[in-house]
């Protein structure tokens, strides 16, 4: 073998040695970042169920190891307040209304950096009784895409009102923006009713947009047999209860300070619950097309678990009311 060949082998040895001198976790980290693709998830749920609180605490935990942007898609504009420690963020729709067009908005005016470097945006909504709140979502997402806000991210999280899945609120589902939907619910009838309706919306667009249901998150209201009830609802919807979040006063303590539990009390057991939920979402591969149930099936489920009374109990209650009225 000639000198040139020996020099070539020496060069190879230097390159290999340089690579192996790096810590294995450094190489693994670089490899993961190269191979990773941005995941777009969405949290849907009935108004008042604790959707925004649950999503922000989960994202705060997820942000410990990932680059994330939150896009608030609720007219209340409360999807980012715990990340930013503020009452409400200026919304895209509000600025667009002030200036007459979204084209006069600068990205820095509506995209703020919060806890753990999470990027925060609120789509906003119109004045009560005027226009469609869902249009704010469409305007916001189009604006963010055009301005390059989706670059260099591991996750985008949409926080969406879910009492009704109308055209505007279904936009992240319909247009395939969010590929994974997580429904925040509880053992209360209306929360479960909303969850089933959201599952219907996912089913409608699953074959055209590729959206899938990632699971139900039970944000506990201390209803009897709540975990078992939501597990059964999840089974009937063809999905999983991905996590049961216990009720804790620590959540309210943190909210009073406009903080997530992850930031306010990172070592508290409730913070560990959100970390566990974030870990399950990060590793989740159980993404399904849901199988919504009928209203009759939902009521039967609630009767079986003692949340609703059966027909006999209903009639007895009516008779008792009549007797009390006569007396």
UniProtKB/Swiss-Prot annotation:
Keywords: 4Fe-4S, ADP-ribosylation, ATP-binding, Iron, Iron-sulfur, Metal-binding, Nitrogen fixation, Nucleotide-binding, Oxidoreductase
Enzyme class: oxidoreductase
Gene3D superfamilies on file: P-loop containing nucleotide triphosphate hydrolases
Statement: the UniProt record of this protein carries the keyword 4Fe-4S: yes
4Fe-4S as UniProt keyword: yes
Modified residues (ADP-ribosylarginine): 135
InterPro entries recorded: NifH/chlL_CS, NifH/frxC, Nitrogenase_Fe_NifH, P-loop_NTPase
GO molecular function, one term: nitrogenase activity
Superkingdom of source: Bacteria
GO biological process: nitrogen fixation
Enzyme Commission number(s): 1.18.6.1
NCBIfam families noted in UniProt: nifH
Known partners and oligomeric status: Homodimer.
Family of this protein: Belongs to the NifH/BchL/ChlL family.
Entry protein name: Nitrogenase iron protein
Taxonomic lineage of the native organism: Bacteria, Bacillati, Cyanobacteriota, Cyanophyceae, Oscillatoriophycideae
């Amino acid at each position: 073998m000639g000198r040139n060949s020996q020099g070539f082998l020496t060069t190879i040895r230097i390159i290999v040695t340089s690579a192996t001198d790096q810590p294995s976790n450094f190489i693994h980290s670089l490899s993961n970042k190269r191979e990773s693709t941005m995941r777009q998830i969405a949290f849907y749920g009935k108004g008042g169920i604790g959707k925004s609180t649950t999503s922000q605490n989960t994202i705060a935990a997820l942000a410990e190891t990932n680059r994330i942007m939150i896009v608030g898609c609720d007219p209340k504009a409360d999807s980012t307040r715990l990340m930013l420690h503020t009452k409400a963020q200026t919304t895209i729709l509000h600025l667009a209304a002030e200036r007459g067009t979204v084209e006069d908005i600068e990205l820095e005016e509506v995209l703020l950096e919060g806890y753990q470097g999470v990027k925060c945006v609120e789509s906003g909504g119109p004045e009560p009784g005027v226009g469609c709140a869902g249009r704010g979502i469409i305007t916001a997402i189009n604006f963010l895409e055009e301005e390059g806000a989706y670059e260099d991210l591991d996750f985008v999280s949409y926080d969406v009102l879910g009492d009704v899945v109308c055209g505007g609120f279904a936009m992240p589902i319909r247009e395939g923006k969010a590929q994974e939907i997580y429904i925040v619910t509880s053992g209360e009838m209306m929360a479960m009713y909303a969850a089933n309706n959201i599952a219907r919306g996912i089913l409608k667009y699953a074959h055209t947009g590729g959206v899938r249901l990632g699971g139900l998150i039970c944000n506990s209201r201390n209803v009897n047999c709540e975990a078992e009830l939501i597990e059964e609802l999840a089974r009937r919807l063809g999905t999983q209860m991905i996590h049961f979040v216990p009720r804790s006063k620590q959540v309210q303590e943190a909210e009073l300070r406009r903080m997530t539990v992850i930031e306010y009390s990172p070592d508290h057991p409730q913070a560990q619950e959100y970390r566990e939920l974030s870990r399950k979402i990060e590793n989740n591969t159980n993404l399904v097309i849901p199988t919504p149930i009928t209203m009759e099936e939902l009521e039967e489920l609630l009767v079986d678990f003692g949340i609703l009374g059966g027909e006999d109990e209903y009639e007895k209650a009516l008779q008792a009311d009549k007797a009390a009225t006569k007396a």
